[in-house]
Amino acid sequence: MLFSQALGLPVITADDATTVGKVADLTVDAHDATVAAVRLSGAADRTEALPWSAVEAVGTDAVIVHSRVTAEQGQDRVPAHHRALGSRVLTEHGVEHGTVRDIAFDPVSGRILTLYTALGEIAGARLMGLGSYAAVVRAEPALTGAVGSP
């Protein structure tokens, strides 16, 4: 699933289909290359985010969460949020690699699969950090043993 597809989806509880809010954004844990939290808008209890562990399922029509998740349970386990979409992308050597256009993630595990940038695709496993200035990725390893070399 893509971040752009998840944005705006209703977030509902599993047991009684109560609407908790809408997906405003997804928080990335760059160290683990996973979605760490679902940022909410329009939540009646003013919950700002729910940890990914509270998510039961992500589909094309809604995000389903455990029914007993509360604001207090969620906030302690949610890392600082930095918007990933639109973020500048730099390698660990400072080489620019465009901006993040979208991100593919596994809707079950939350694992980041691919960053789609203005200059091409980057494997999620290469993500090293995400801050207010940029997303930092590992540079691609240099090719060795090129054709024609000894």
Locate the predicted segments by residue.
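Peripheral interaction segments used for macromolecular assembly
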Residues: 1-150
